[in-house]
């Protein structure tokens, strides 16, 4: 995503050496920064998205072909997009450990189930709203499952005492973005 601005790649790159050295404290410190960065991005997306609501009717104009309330559809999309940023650092850590098969496998199962349910709902209901809700539930289910797997496999992520990184190292991270 454009809003990610390469932060994920820079931090995953920064994780490789501490992972190779099994330096859990450094990994926890990097993940703290990663979590903060993504929470900030997700929050900015949510705030800007909510601030845009009064202007949607000017951007969209009249949309007579849409039966459902456009503002509700927009709100669901906004929630789905912004909330995903609050979990993405977990999948990045799993990928940095070169266990991307966990991320891909989980995504495959959730996407397959989601698609089946969405097709059935479209055939039965002929409405976009249930389709969109299932998409959001699928995204949230994926995020929660990946977060639970990461927290189970890497319990040091729960540490509250991870030392902050030195400012020079943080600057180096942002130079790599």
Residue ranges and their predicted role:
Residues 146-177:
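Interhelical loop/hinge segments that connect adjacent transmembrane helices in multipass membrane
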Residues 35-62, 116-123:
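Alpha-helical transmembrane segments of multi-pass membrane transport and lipid-handling proteins
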Residues 38, 42, 74-77, 107-111, ...:
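Residue-level recognition of transmembrane alpha-helices
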């Amino acid at each position: 995503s454009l809003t990610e601005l390469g932060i994920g790649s820079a931090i995953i790159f920064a994780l490789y050496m501490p992972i190779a050295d099994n330096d859990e404290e450094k990994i926890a410190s990097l993940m703290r920064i990663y979590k903060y960065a993504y929470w900030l991005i997700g929050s900015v997306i949510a705030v800007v998205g909510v601030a845009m609501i009064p202007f949607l009717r000017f951007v969209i104009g009249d949309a007579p072909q849409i039966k459902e309330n456009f503002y509700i559809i927009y709100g669901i999309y906004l929630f789905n997009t912004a909330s995903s940023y609050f979990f993405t650092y977990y999948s990045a850590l799993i990928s940095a450990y070169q266990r991307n098969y966990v991320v891909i496998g989980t995504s495959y199962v959730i996407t397959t189930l989601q698609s089946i349910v969405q097709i059935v709902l479209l055939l039965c209901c002929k409405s976009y709203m249930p389709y969109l809700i299932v998409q959001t539930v699928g995204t949230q289910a994926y995020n929660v499952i990946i977060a639970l797997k990461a927290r189970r496999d890497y319990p040091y992520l729960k540490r509250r005492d991870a030392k902050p990184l030195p400012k020079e190292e943080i600057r180096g991270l942002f130079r790599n973005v």
